[in-house]
């Protein structure tokens, strides 16, 4: 069997990130609550995708890539971090984003511009039918120029990228052992493309077999994620040569906290942003972590997360997305 450190990885983030106790919020919910501060990964504005990109950019460097192409939403944290990582290793970033070209560049779009990314915008209604062709067209254009291109899928959600969150479990395991504390009962994390959840599932089964993982969807329905994440977890475990078997029924997804659509702030998510900011001084965002925290709060209130549980919330970053939604937040 292999370990996550057996795979080639570049150094991008500042690890280990803190595992911070949220006493005020946890007490109000009747649980022991820690937050894994992957908003503090540091590189390119921080966030969970740094863990995945350490493996994915090592692959790009090994292949001597000139152009890195990826996709995401209008305010994609993943796309922003791919742009930063590409520049660090002397590669050109191309971002194909879901949404119309803005009149003003704010939040992650501003940072994309600062990193010098080439941006293409796809109409939201046709995005899913056009995205593969659009990214392939950029790869073909690079090849015609004599350059080598690499396409990184949405969210960096690949079995190789998922190793980043196997490593995160190993990191948290060491942090809890240093504290003299047991494994958590529950881990809660947002999911938009599935790679983070796949890595958490694989790592937890190895190190914390009794810990439940809850993915709070910010985009798709539960059954789509269950199929996708179980397949990715299986492929990730196979990479590691760990004897694990995964089915869709193994994956716990809550899809009732999306709101009207991906990338659109929800009332419950905004309430959670205010609550956490005013209870703990921690900033969440309206696209991912606000909705995921809304899910965590609701699941504790409903008893789906039992009173007295030890809970870890994975903060995947995304604070640049607060600013484009400033008026929505202030009018709430």
Positions of predicted regions on the chain:
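PLP-dependent amino-acid enzyme catalytic core
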Residues: 1-332
């Amino acid at each position: 069997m292999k370990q996550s450190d057996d795979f080639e990885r570049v150094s991008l983030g500042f690890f280990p990130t803190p595992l911070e106790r949220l006493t005020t919020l946890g007490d109000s919910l009747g649980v022991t609550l820690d937050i894994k501060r992957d908003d503090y990964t540091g590189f390119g504005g921080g966030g969970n995708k740094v863990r995945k990109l350490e493996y994915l950019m090592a692959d790009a460097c090994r292949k001597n890539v000139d152009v890195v192409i990826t996709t995401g939403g209008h305010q994609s944290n993943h796309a922003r971090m791919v742009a930063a990582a590409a520049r660090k290793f002397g590669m050109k970033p191309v971002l194909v984003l879901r949404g119309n070209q803005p009149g003003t560049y704010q939040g992650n779009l501003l940072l994309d511009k600062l990193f010098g990314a080439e941006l293409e915008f796809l109409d939201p209604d046709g995005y899913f039918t056009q995205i593969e062709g659009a990214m392939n067209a950029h790869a073909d254009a690079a090849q015609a120029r004599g350059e080598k291109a690499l396409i990184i899928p949405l969210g960096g959600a690949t079995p190789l990228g998922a190793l980043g969150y196997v490593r995160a479990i190993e990191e948290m395991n060491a942090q809890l052992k240093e504290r003299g504390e047991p494994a958590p009962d529950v881990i809660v994390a947002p999911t938009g493309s599935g790679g983070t959840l796949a890595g958490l599932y694989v790592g937890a089964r190895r190190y914390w077999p009794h810990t439940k993982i809850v993915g709070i969807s910010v985009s798709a329905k539960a059954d789509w994620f269950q199929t996708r994440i179980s397949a990715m977890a299986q492929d990730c475990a196979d990479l590691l040569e760990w004897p694990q078997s995964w089915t869709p029924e193994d994956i716990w997804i809550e899809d009732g906290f999306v709101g009207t659509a991906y990338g659109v702030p929800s009332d419950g998510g905004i309430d959670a942003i205010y609550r956490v900011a005013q209870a703990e001084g921690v900033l969440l965002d309206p696209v991912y972590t606000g909705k995921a925290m809304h899910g965590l709060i609701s699941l504790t209130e409903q008893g789906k997360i039992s009173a007295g549980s030890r809970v870890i919330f994975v903060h995947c970053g995304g604070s640049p997305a607060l600013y484009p939604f400033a008026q929505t937040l202030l009018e709430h």
